[in-house]
Every structure is written in C-alpha cells, then in structure tokens.
Regions:
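Short hydrophobic/small-residue motifs within alpha-helical transmembrane segments
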Residues: 50-57, 143-145, 233
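Conserved MFS/SLC helix-loop-helix module at the cytosolic interface between two early adjacent transmembrane helices
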Residues: 58-97
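Cytoplasmic helix-loop-helix junction between adjacent transmembrane helices
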Residues: 103-140
Length: 234
C-alpha cells in the first residue's frame, strides 16, 4: 500500500505550482493589459512585483514560525483563500495602486504559505530516509506551475479579457487547492498512527535540528545577517 506521505507530496506540488505560477510566473502577463487600462507605464506596474518581494521578506519568518506551531491544513487553506481573494480583487481593481496593494499583500501571503516554506516543511515531516527524493519531486510543482499557469491565464485573457481571466483563475485556484488540502493534509505521520517513510521506527536523520528558540522571528528581524541575505535574494 502506498505510503500516505506521497499524497502529501502531491498536494504540496499542487500548492507550489499554483502559488508560484500565479505570483512569480504570471505577473508579466498582467502588466500590459492593466497598464493600458490604467494608463500606467511599465516601471510603475512593476511596483506590484517589488511590493510582493518586500512583503515576502517580512512575512517569511513569521510564516515559518506558524508552520512549526499551527495546523498545516489551516495555514494552507488560508493561503489558498488569500490567492483566490487576491485574484478576485485584482479583477475589480479601479486603479494601479489598488492592484499593487492587493498583489503586494494578499498574493504575497498566499504564495508564502503555499510556497517553499509551507510545502517543504510539511513534506519534510513525512519523510526521513527518503526526504531528498520527496522534496525533489515536490519541487517539480514549481516548474509545472511556471509552464501551465501562465499558459492558462494567457488563454483566458485572450478569450475574455484580463478581468474575467483573473476571476477564472481565482475560482480555479480555490477549487484545485481547498478540497485536497482539507481532505489530505495532516501535520505529521503520528496524526495517522504512522512513522516517517512508512517504516516502523523511522526517525529523523542525523543532523536535522529543530528551530532554536533564539531564532524566533522577533530576534531574527534584528539580525543583520538575515537582512543581508534577504536583500540579496529579494
């Protein structure tokens, strides 16, 4: 019988694909039609992506802490709702600043909770000896999302215009994410009476340590090294 953890991997792939596909890979498809309608140049339109990157830097430490302490199923559901609500609000935005605000806040929260922080954390809990393989398969979701989501969004924009296309993507994200998240995602193998990898007595591999109390977000936010890395990445 297939180990339950592989179901977690499939949901994590889906979460990564849709979140990265909508936020990172599809942004460029919205720049031209929104800029044309709102009379904004491309430099101004790119502020949405800048705001999203800045928000992600600030949100990520807290998202990681929440993943350690709260239900992954609830946090993934919140992320899915944020993505769907964000796309819905973009569809009814009246000016470029509303678009930038929604993209920089709601879409960033959704992508952070459903992205590598959330997906990799939940997958790592379900695997020990096969953790590398499981994480590698999960990462495929990013590439698939980068290929399929922009293709679908562009098709919808060509057929219905960008506003209706965004509403369609909101509905698709909600329908594809919420049911499997709620039905499949569990915090740890122990919740179902299982062990990591599905093996009796399987445990954490040597060298895997828990997050130290001193690395909690409030202290991390004052760490100069953290900000240097964050600025280099984002």
């Amino acid at each position: 019988m297939m180990f339950y953890g592989w179901r977690i991997v499939v949901v994590a792939m889906l979460a990564l694909g849709l979140s990265n596909g909508l936020v990172s890979y599809s942004y460029g498809l919205l720049v031209l039609p929104l800029g044309t309608e709102f009379g904004a140049n491309r430099m101004l339109m790119m502020w949405g992506l800048t705001a999203s990157s800045m928000a992600t830097v600030l949100i990520s430490p807290f998202a990681g802490s929440l993943m350690d302490r709260r239900s992954a199923r609830v946090l993934f559901s919140v992320g899915a709702v944020c993505l769907a609500l964000g796309m819905s609000l973009i569809a009814v935005s009246r000016n470029v600043w509303e678009f930038i605000l929604v993209f920089g806040l709601l879409m960033s929260v959704g992508a952070t909770l459903l992205g590598p922080i959330g997906a990799n954390t939940i997958v790592a809990r379900w695997f020990a000896q096969r953790r590398g393989r499981a994480l590698g398969i999960t990462a495929i979701g990013t590439s698939l999302g980068g290929l399929l989501v922009p293709l679908l969004l562009q098709t919808l924009i060509d057929a219905y215009g960008w506003r209706i296309a965004c509403l369609w993507m909101a509905a698709i994200a909600l329908l594809l994410l919420l049911p499997p998240i709620w039905l499949v995602v569990r915090n740890r193998p122990a919740d179902l009476g299982l062990q990591p990898d599905g093996q009796p007595g399987a445990g954490q591999p040597t060298g895997v340590a828990s997050l130290a109390a001193g690395s909690a977000p409030p202290r991390l936010m004052t760490d100069a090294s953290f900000w240097r890395i964050a600025l280099a990445v984002g």
